Curated annotation (Swiss-Prot):
Stated name of the protein: Adenylosuccinate synthetase isozyme 2
Localization per record: Cytoplasm; Mitochondrion
Upper taxonomic lineage: Eukaryota, Metazoa, Chordata, Craniata, Vertebrata
Annotated gene: Adss2
Function: Plays an important role in the de novo pathway and in the salvage pathway of purine nucleotide biosynthesis. Catalyzes the first committed step in the biosynthesis of AMP from IMP.
Description of pH dependence: Optimum pH is 6.6-6.9.
Length: 456
């Protein structure tokens, strides 16, 4: 006899609620900042803006393959692994379980930024690291380089990775052979044994790989002493933050939607989920605590490394965008490929992430153009397609349909309100809003914190 047929508990309430108390909902909401293109959109600047009155700033995925630049008081800080919001002295920075951590890289990054200015004073007391975060070892990075070399030799092309060990460490994680922060700080003898097993596995897979096992363990022991006070139960920490007194919690996404391991232009992607779902799995929090989701969009499009790029301008236009925008990767120093804004890919990113508003950055880079093109549709074999193709070969074949808008030929870098922008610049912003059906909340017209125009 089934409950649905005869149990009074199933029928006692009109809504089918069996009389049990509902789980407590509510709590603080997190504000999420995500890249909506192929990275390098200016997420760091938006985070810097929001972090000024934040209590906690989180990283939920990726490693030191990401690159964020923040300019404060004319000092340029570069972040790869640390949440860039840590530059606010009142912020607690949290690195979640979805992040992969190269300890030498973490301390090197912190020390370089400490030398630049006062932004990172006391950072070690303001950083919390999830005990469930996986560790990137030097041999992961070495293996990354060997894999790229093998791809080049075998297929004539590589993935264009940053060689920071991100793919190999996420592979170790999925294969359940990886090591986590909790292993390092809880039982170093047990950690050492597992480290040796993993290192020897890598040596058997890559015979040319040289690993100084004892030397690296000695180095890791030194890092363990420094890192131990920062390592906490991340799930408990965040739960307390979400359900305690009111707090402003900010999540800083790394990489971007089109680099997501599932939804990006696979295989030319990163190895983590950099869309909104990665926020919940990478921090250990339920989706009902996600509040605003801000997508960061460059006023044109760039991409580092190889992979399909429908609106790319491999010509004087692309060169002008590259030069004016100073489009070099923060992590690798590689030139970024440049092209027109692609609304097809942005609509796709919105379908996945549900952006509540956009930050449109680097609008000033378009100042010199008499006309500006925007990709509004893809055609394949002469027919418009309603979706963003999953297959790279198909994406490489699409013909982009453009809408041409008049430029403004005016320096807009001193504009501080929307009304101060030329009419054609205003129209460009409104066109993007109308096409995507997402409001633009900020417009970037320069590098500094002050050059972000807020619309609402």
């Amino acid at each position: 006899m089934s409950i649905s047929e005869s149990s009074p508990a199933a029928t006692s309430l009109p809504n089918g609620d069996c009389g049990r108390p509902r789980a407590r909902s509510g709590g603080n909401r997190v504000t999420v900042v995500l890249g909506a293109q192929w990275g390098d959109e200016g997420k760091g600047k938006v985070v810097d803006l929001l972090a000024q009155d934040a209590d906690i700033v989180c990283r939920c995925q990726g490693g030191n393959n990401a690159g964020h630049t923040v300019v404060v008081d004319s000092v340029e800080y570069d972040f790869h692994l640390l949440p860039s919001g840590i530059i606010n002295p009142n912020v607690t920075a949290f690195i979640g379980n979805g992040v992969v951590i190269h300890l030498p890289g973490l301390f090197e990054e912190a020390e370089k930024n400490v030398q630049k200015g006062k932004g990172l004073d006391g950072w070690e007391k303001r950083l919390i690291i999830s005990d469930r975060a996986h560790i990137v070892f030097d041999f992961h990075q070495a293996a990354d380089g060997i894999q790229e070399q093998q791809r080049q030799e075998q297929a004539g092309k590589n993935l264009g990775t940053t060689k920071k060990g991100i793919g190999p460490v996420y592979s170790s994680k999925a294969a359940r052979s990886g090591l986590r922060m909790c292993d390092l700080v809880s039982d170093f003898d047990g950690f050492s044994e597992r480290f040796k097993v993993l290192a020897n596995q890598y040596k058997s897979i890559y015979p040319t790989l040289e690993i100084d096992i004892e030397g690296e363990l000695q180095q890791l022991k030194g890092y363990m002493e420094r890192i131990k006070p920062m390592v906490k139960d991340g799930v408990y920490f965040l739960y307390e933050a979400l359900h305690g007194p009111p707090k402003k919690i900010l999540v800083e996404g790394a990489n971007a939607a089109l680099l997501d391991i599932d939804f990006g232009t696979y295989p030319f992607v990163t190895s983590s989920n950099c869309t909104v779902g990665g926020v919940c799995t990478g921090l250990g929090m339920p989706p009902q605590n996600v509040g605003e989701v801000y997508g960061v969009v460059k006023a044109y499009t760039t991409r580092v490394g190889i992979g399909a790029f429908p609106t790319e301008q491999d010509n004087e236009i692309g060169e002008l965008l590259q030069t004016r925008g100073r489009e070099f990767g923060v992590t690798t120093g590689r030139k970024r490929r440049c092209g027109w804004l692609d609304l097809v890919s942005l609509k796709y990113a919105h379908m996945i992430n549900g952006f509540t508003a956009l930050a449109l950055t680097k609008l000033d880079i378009l100042d010199m153009f008499t006309e500006i093109k925007v990709g509004v549709a893809y055609k394949l074999d002469g027919e418009t397609i309603p979706h963003f193709p999953a297959n790279q070969e198909v994406l490489n074949k699409v013909e982009v349909q453009y809408k041409t808008l008049p430029g403004w030929n005016t320096d807009i870098s001193n504009a501080r309100t929307f009304k101060e922008l030329p009419v054609n610049a205003q129209n460009y912003v409104r066109f993007i809003e109308d096409e995507l059906q997402i409001p633009v909340k900020w417009i970037g017209v320069g590098k500094s914190r002050e050059s972000m125009i807020q619309l609402f």
